[in-house]
Amino acid sequence: MFKRLSLYTLLLCLVPFFIWGISYQWHGNSQLTQADYWLYLLTETGSVPYALITCVLFTLLFAFLFKNPKQWILGVIVMGISVIATQAAKTGAKALFEEPRPFTVYLAEQTHSTPENFYKNDRTLRAEIAKNFYSMDAITPAWLVHHYENETGYSFPSGHTIFAATWLMLAVGFTQLLGNRSFKAKLLVVGIAVWGLLMLISRVRLGMHYPIDLLVATLLAWLINSIIFAFLKKKAIFVMK
């Protein structure tokens, strides 16, 4: 199980490594295409409140992996613990490191200010500043202005990435733990892996994160879920029979 969790973690880590490899850096929205709107819709599946719908959907999609309703209910509790623990780790790291997002750095550069001055304001004022600046930018579409307005927190690590990576770890972990090797189980893992990869790409493409934010968030999800599944392996109700 540990090897399989690590394998899918490595898969997600290919995104930041590839971005570094091609020396891609976001600096404004001049390269936006129609495809980026679809990435925005996908990234919203990890944004509040839509992330709650995503969680409910995944808990239902995971149901067939479990042998009985009791096992599924316990599995849902584990899923909740995993999501809460990883989001708590992300929130703590953001508060500790206070790294600005790419789009806020760009805003500061263009207004001859500094990211530090931007983040001295409360969230309401930061949202207003971001909205006013990017609304005047002809190349930034309204949907992205709205996204910036709602995402004026810190950058490191990526909350959307840790959310997607956590659900991939849960899919891989439970299929391994419960010994479900069915085509449906494989399809579930592959589907979530593709969703996760696109989520990571969207965060850099839309000016929300740097590659290091994605890498550390993915590794945090791997670490926390590796601990969770190492614990679950010792519990009889989840042991393969």
UniProtKB/Swiss-Prot annotation:
One GO term of the biological process aspect: phospholipid catabolic process
Annotated spans, Phosphatase sequence motif I: 94-102
Membrane-topology descriptor: Multi-pass membrane protein
Site (Stabilizes the active site histidine for nucleophilic attack): D213
A Gene Ontology cellular-component term: cell outer membrane
Origin: domain of life: Bacteria
Stretches for region Phosphatase sequence motif II: 157-160
Coiled coil: none
MF (Gene Ontology): diacylglycerol diphosphate phosphatase activity; phosphatidate phosphatase activity; phosphatidylglycerophosphatase activity; undecaprenyl-diphosphatase activity
Active-site feature positions: H160 (proton donor), H209 (nucleophile)
Gene3D superfamilies: Phosphatidic acid phosphatase type 2/haloperoxidase
Region (Phosphatase sequence motif III): 202-213
Protein's UniProt keywords contain tRNA-binding: no
Keyword Hydrolase: yes
Keywords tagged on the record: Cell inner membrane, Cell membrane, Cell outer membrane, Hydrolase, Lipid degradation, Lipid metabolism, Membrane, Phospholipid degradation, Phospholipid metabolism, Transmembrane, Transmembrane helix
EC supergroup of this enzyme: hydrolase
This protein's pathway: Phospholipid metabolism; phosphatidylglycerol biosynthesis; phosphatidylglycerol from CDP-diacylglycerol: step 2/2
Compartments where found: Cell inner membrane; Cell outer membrane
Reactions performed catalytically: a 1,2-diacyl-sn-glycero-3-phospho-(1'-sn-glycero-3'-phosphate) + H2O = a 1,2-diacyl-sn-glycero-3-phospho-(1'-sn-glycerol) + phosphate; a 1,2-diacyl-sn-glycerol 3-diphosphate + H2O = a 1,2-diacyl-sn-glycero-3-phosphate + phosphate + H(+); a 1,2-diacyl-sn-glycero-3-phosphate + H2O = a 1,2-diacyl-sn-glycerol + phosphate; di-trans,octa-cis-undecaprenyl diphosphate + H2O = di-trans,octa-cis-undecaprenyl phosphate + phosphate + H(+)
Chain ranges passing through the membrane: 1-21, 53-62, 68-91, 159-173, 185-204, 211-235
Periplasmic face of the membrane: 22-52, 92-158, 205-210
Family, as annotated: Belongs to the PA-phosphatase related phosphoesterase family.
Name of the protein this chain belongs to: Phosphatidylglycerophosphatase B
The organism of origin for this protein: Haemophilus influenzae (strain ATCC 51907 / DSM 11121 / KW20 / Rd)
Gene designation per UniProt: pgpB
